[in-house]
Every structure is written in structure tokens, then in C-alpha cells.
Amino acid sequence: MLSTLIKKMFGSRNERTLRRMEKSVMAINAFEPKMQALSNEELAGKTQEFKERFNNGESLDELLAEAFATVREVSLRTLGLRHFDVQLIGGMVLHEGNIAEMRTGEGKTLVATLPAYLNAISGRGVHIVTVNDYLAKRDSQWMKPIYEFLGLTVGVIYPDMSHKEKQEAYKADIVYGTNNEYGFDYLRDNMAFSLTDKVQRELNFAIVDEVDSILIDEARTPLIISGAAEDSSELYIKINSLIPQLKKQEEEGDEGDYTIDEKQKQAHLTDAGHLHIEELLTKAKLLDPGESLYHASNIMLMHHVNAALKAHAMFHRDIDYIVKDNQVVIVDEHTGRTMPGRRWSEGLHQAVEAKEGVPIQNENQTLASITFQNFFRMYNKLSGMTGTADTEAYEFQQIYNLEVVVIPTNRSMIRKDEADLVYLTQADKFQAIIEDVRECGVRRQPVLVGTVSIEASEFLSQLLKKENIKHQVLNAKFHEKEAQIIAEAGRPGAVTIATNMAGRGTDIVLGGSLAADLANLPADASEQEKEAVKKEWQKRHDEVIAAGGLRIIGSERHESRRIDNQLRGRAGRQGDPGSSRFYLSLEDNLMRIFASERVASMMRRLGMQPGEPIEHSLVTRAIENAQRKLEGHHFDVRKQLLDYDNVANDQRQVIYTQRSSIMAMTDTQEVVEMMREEVMDSLVDTYIPPQSLEDQWDPQALSDVLSDEFKIKAPVPDWIDKDHSIQPEKIKEKILALAIEHYDEKVRKVGRPVISQFEKSIILQTLDNHWREHLAAMDQLRQGIHLRGYAQKDPKQEYKKEAFSLFTMMLDNLKYEVIRILSSVEIQTEEDAHVVEEQRRADQIRKMNLMHESLSENDEASETQTFRRQEKKIGRNDPCPCGSGKKYKACHGSLV
């Protein structure tokens, strides 16, 4: 009651926003006579003037009125299109970082030019996001004359562009492209090996066309770049045959090729073992005569040897794994249960498969992934436009913090939306649809029949064929052809069947597309021929208006009211006449699940017979209530999933920030020194635990690990024998000094610049490998975390806790691996230092799979996330986003 009273007194939030913006419209209109008086050169010079004023301290908001007036005048001169006042309001809504709901035919493509131009003045770039490549190319070409007149550059991105072409496109002031392409380019940039390989600039301002489709419908499925792991089956098999020839060292001081550490579940080659395996590898022609296994070019070979040794020495059949159906299945050491689908990482699983003689699987690995909600939230400012957003306004506000502003139409809407007709059976419903289509055909009224699935559209097509009714079928497979058919769907007597999502972005013009007719004329067509085409189009246009405009028939209600409204919105553009009606049956999915009992009992009470429909506003209201419930359910699901996504996203931000910092470094000495100190401290703490008695120490094992893994000769037992009062901190100091001395010898051989390049390559390669394995671990954690609910634990909190633990472990392992490789690999020349980078680049050339499973036509709304970057770049003294409470530099920022 109170909210209704306040609305009556002050107007709704939407009305207040529109009233505020109407004042700005008056200011823009006041500039119009001045703009009309300017020459083309003077008008084009406005851009430079605005840039200078912006650089001198004027804000974009202060420039808005004059800039919008400039664009309107240029649009009229170049395209013959003048922005309506309501389009100016739409442009202001987008500039403020909100969503403009504008009906079909209200010129959203033209509206985008206003905020795009204004925000391009800052020089930081604008991305306009479309749902398919056809629309990106069409819209960029269509609006290009406006931007080029004003001295701005326009780029368009699409798949299969060369790297150089894409870099050039992104340098443009205004870039058009699809949501998929922007997302994949972001992921590829964060897999690049140097800053010069990146294509994207700052993610500054995005204008998302069909924002509901991208931020809600498509948000559920992530963008994934996956790559087939390199097929090393033959190498695993060859090395597997060599390992049984190695002999285990039983006691300290005995002969043997390798030792085992059961506590750490590790196996290490001894000095004799190194020589022996090098000899065996040389005989097998896997190593050149006289070459060391620890040469920089043999890092991958060393990795395979370590995996094979571990598989033979530490992993035993029917204890650690079983062989079932010709596959190696892991056994959980805690529960004794098998874990189908789980695989050991770092090549260990393949090494065990080679040992057991079963087929070696090279699975696809996820190299990088991101959801649209997490990608678009990184923009400094995000806005969107669509014909149908108001029904999802709560979700946009709650999850993206985006306001939806409903923009009034330029002309009054006169479309007639008729009440739903409900039948007992689907057969009755389809028969009624056929009759409606036939009646429209008699009066030559164009019809668009919307279906919820491709299957339904093809079934209806078969029924129309039986009745000899000529029609076109659209099911969103070929965008360019689709746009052409949709454009012609307004011709007299045209019948078009389309899935609900088909043809978004293209208007159905009554009488057909005049632009298409003119384009079909020969290039040298005379004015008379053009005039004849225009007259013919006008005749068709008038005929369709006389017949009642476009008729919309819905063959079933969708789970979302928004999709139903999209279908209805095809008719009644720019004040055109039109009508719409939905035909339903009690056998439809939505009716069967939610409304069938109530409606069926109502039909029985009214004595309805098969073939007879029920038409009542109560029925329509009951159906819409069912849709609201379902929308609420989907929103809750998306919100839940979003909470999980945010955990992974925080980790991604940390990794990508560190990665970019490392790529930008010319000298990595400080980073490596910090890592080395942490790794050595951690090693000492493992074998000589803090606050422990000397009896609990294992100095020999510590010496062995330092020797085997890091090639550091540290006689820790001797130090303790000589001085029983020695403290762990002193041992750490001595080990670190030896590690530095050992590494400094390598630096002296080839020089600091060469070593820095090698260090950077090793850090990036190791980071990428560990991040890839971490993504798989996070996925496995996510799949089973809901079971914690049965133990009265909050799955979300458990997921955060375990994800943090996994992330910390991953970074610890990463540092250990980097220092191990840098300590053990031999670098003799500058060429050796470039080997890793060359291997890495070769890996990147391998074809990567780009995956984004778009929702099928009958899939429902989806995941979502927030709007305008509320998190600035992570500062060294800011709290770490992982949630530990520590400063970033003391937590996950310690890598950089």
C-alpha cells in the first residue's frame, strides 16, 4: 500500500529517471541549430576539440549534450538517420552503465553510436558486443560512416583472423565482436608467452546488444579453451621398458640406482642411477651420445623418467590402483574405494598405464576457462540493450548491479495481444494453429509462428506441408540466411516458422525489406527503376497494414516470460499494427508440470469437449504465475552457482595478475630468490619440524632430497654431529647459502640477462602446467562438494575452504618445481636458455579447441554475475582476494 502511494506521489524509479534525462534531451536539442550550421570539416573537428577538453579536465558527462548532438547531425548527413529523442535517452542510459529496454524496431544499433562515440573520446576503447558474427560485421559496416566522419577508427573481430589482424582491430577506438570472441581472446591473452603476443587492450567500456541473451541465457556455460595433451604414448612405452633395469638402493651407502621416500611417496635417482639411465636412454636413441639428461633441451625427457620411476617404485597394483576393463582405476588410500574418472597428474597416470600395458589415454585438458559473468564484470563500465529485460530487472540488479530503464517507444504501441487459448491435447492445439495460419493466408496477412524447439518447428512444418501451405523454416543455424529470411517475413501472405531465439537483431519490416529489394538491382540501375521498386514495396506495405500487420502465433509458452515477450515483440514495431496469440495444450511441458490440474478441473466444470479451447484471463494469469515461480527457481540456481564461480574467479585474477607481472619483468632475480628461500625453508621444516626434538629429525633424508632434486650437496648429518646445539634456523641459512652458491655458478657461465630469460620461461611454463592441473582439481572438488550437506556442513563454505587449500598447495608445488628445474638443469650457452621458450611456443601452435556450448532453443535461462568492476587492480598492500585475511604481498602475491 505504502509503495503504491509513494509511486502515485513521486512516480516510479523508471519515470523519475526518464524525467531527469528529458532535461538532458532539451540541452542536446538546443545544440542542434549550431551543429546544422557547421561545415563537414568543422563538424569532424569536434572530436579533437572534445579530446582536448577531456584532457583538460572536463568529464564525459559534461561533454555529453554537445557530443550527442554532434553524432546526431553526423548520422543525418552520412546515413540519413536522425536520432529520435527516445534514442537519445537510450544512449544516456547506456553511458551511465545501465540496461536500456527498447522495443523491437526502435533502432538499438543506432542508439549505441551515441555512448560509443562519447566514451571513445577518452582514448581507452569501446567494445560493442553482439550475439553472432554476422551482426558484428553488419553493424560495424552500417555505422562505420558516422565514426569515420568523426575521425574515429572502427574494428571488427571474428574467428579465423590472423594474430596481426586481430591486434590491429583491437587498437581501434570502437570494436565490434561477439561475446564468445572477446572472451576467448581474453583467455588466449592470458596464455600468451610475452606482452607483445597479447591482442586486447584495457577492458574499459562494453555495450552488450541482446544483453538478456548474453548475461542470462548464455551465462550458465563457460568459455573453455582445451588442448589435447601431446601424444607421448610411444615415449612412455619406451621409457617404461628401461626402468626395470634400474636397481633399488636398499640401505644408505649400498649400490643402487634409486632411493625411495615412502613418507613423501617419492623416488629419486642416485648419482649412479643418473649415469645408468643416461646410458640406457642413449642405447634407446632417446639421448644423443655424451648428452646429459639435465641439459635444458631434455626437460620433458627428465619429466617422463621421473614419472616412470615413480610408477614402478611407489605405485602398486591392487593397492594404489586396480586394472579394470583395460583401464587403470585409482583406489582411494583412505577409504579403499575406487575412483573412476579420476587421474593422477604430471604424467604419472600415463606412466602407470604404460607399466600395466593398457592403452595410454591422452585426454583433453582444460587450458583456461571463464564464465561470461566473470568476464564482463572486469570491464570498468558495462551496459546493455535489449527488447526484453524488465522481467529480469531484479536479477540484473541483484547480480550485476545494473538498473533496467524501460525506454518509451517513439510511436504508440498498437499491437493487439490476445488471450491464450488452451486445448486438452496437442493435436487439437496444432489443428487450431493450422486454421489460424490458413485464415491469415486468405487475407494475405504475414504470419510468424514461434516454437520452443527445433523438433517442434519441424513437426509443424510437416503439418503445413500436408495442408499445402507454403512456408519458410528457421532454426538458427545460418545467421546470414536467417537474417535474410526474417527480413522478408513481412511480405503479404508470408508464413515463417522460427524457434524463439531465431533472427534476433533483424527487424521484420511490413511488406518485406526495401533495402534488400534495392540491393538486388543492378549497380547501374536508373532512378526510374529504383522508384518503381519503392512503389512496389509501398503497395505491399499498405496491403499488409490493411490485413492487420504481422500476426504472431506462439505454439507453446516458454519457461520464461521474457522469451514469450521477445516473440510478441516481433510485431508492432514503430507503431505498426499487429497481433499475437499463444496456443497451448494440457500436454505442453509447462502446463503439464505446473498448471494442468487446476486448468483441467476448470475445463471439466465448464463441460469442455475435445477440440474446444478455454479462453480466460484467469488461465493466462495462472500460466504467468507458473512462469514466475520457475524464473525464481532458475534465478536461485544461478545465484548459487555464482557463489561457487566467484571462488574460482578470485584465484584466476591472482594467477593472471602474477602472470602479467612476470611477463613484464626484464629481471626475474628477485622473484627466483624469494621462491628459493621459501622452498628451502619449507624443505627444512618437513624433515626438521619446528619446535621438535632432535630425535624427530631426519637430516639424512633432507640431504638426499637436496642432492637428488636440487643437485645441492649439503652434509646436514655432519653439521649436526659437529654441533648438537645447532638450530633449524642456522641449518636453513647454511642450506640457502649453498643453494645460492650452486646457482650463481650457472649465472656466471652465461650471464644474468640470459638466465633471466630462462627463468621467466620456466616460471611461465610451470605456472601454466600447474594452473591447468588446478582447474581439473577444482572441477572435481565442485562435482562432489554438495555431499558435505549430508554431514550438516555448508557446502559453499567447505568449497571455499578446500579451494583455498588446493590453491595454496598449487602455489607451493609451483615454487618447488621452478626451483627444482632451475637448480638441476644445465645451461651451457645462450641457445640453451631459449629452448624452453621455443618448446612452449610450439605447444601453443598446436590447435586449441574453443568451446562454448550455447543453450539449445528449449534451454532456459541461466547463470549471471555482476556489472561494473567493483574490484580494482590488486595492490601489493591490499587484502588478498583468496580470503586469508593477509596482505596480497604476504600471501598469493608473494610470487611477484
UniProtKB/Swiss-Prot annotation:
Top-level division of the source organism's lineage: Bacteria
Residues that coordinate or bind Zn(2+): 880, 882, 891-892
Family matches, as CDD domains: DEXDc_SecA, SF2_C_secA
InterPro entries: Helicase_ATP-bd, Helicase_C-like, P-loop_NTPase, SEC_C_motif, SecA, SecA_CS, SecA_DEAD, SecA_motor_DEAD
Catalyses which reaction(s): ATP + H2O + cellular proteinSide 1 = ADP + phosphate + cellular proteinSide 2
Biased composition (Basic and acidic residues): 866-876
GO biological process: intracellular protein transmembrane transport; protein import; protein targeting; protein transport by the Sec complex
Keyword set includes Acetylation: no
Record-listed E.C. numbers: 7.4.2.8
Matching Gene3D superfamilies: Helical scaffold and wing domains of SecA, P-loop containing nucleotide triphosphate hydrolases, SecA, preprotein cross-linking domain
Keywords: ATP-binding, Cell inner membrane, Cell membrane, Cytoplasm, Membrane, Metal-binding, Nucleotide-binding, Protein transport, Translocase, Translocation, Transport, Zinc
Pfam family, one: SecA_SW
Broad EC category: translocase
GO CC annotations on file: cell envelope Sec protein transport complex; cytosol; plasma membrane
GO molecular-function term, one example from the UniProt record: ATP binding
UniProt-listed SMART domains: SecA_DEAD, SecA_PP_bind
PANTHER family: CHLOROPLAST PROTEIN-TRANSPORTING ATPASE (PTHR30612:SF0), SECA INNER MEMBRANE COMPONENT OF SEC PROTEIN SECRETION SYSTEM (PTHR30612)
Known role: Part of the Sec protein translocase complex. Interacts with the SecYEG preprotein conducting channel. Has a central role in coupling the hydrolysis of ATP to the transfer of proteins into and across the cell membrane, serving both as a receptor for the preprotein-SecB complex and as an ATP-driven molecular motor driving the stepwise translocation of polypeptide chains across the membrane.
HAMAP family: SecA
Protein name (database record): Protein translocase subunit SecA
Species annotation: Legionella pneumophila subsp. pneumophila (strain Philadelphia 1 / ATCC 33152 / DSM 7513)
Lineage: Bacteria, Pseudomonadati, Pseudomonadota, Gammaproteobacteria, Legionellales
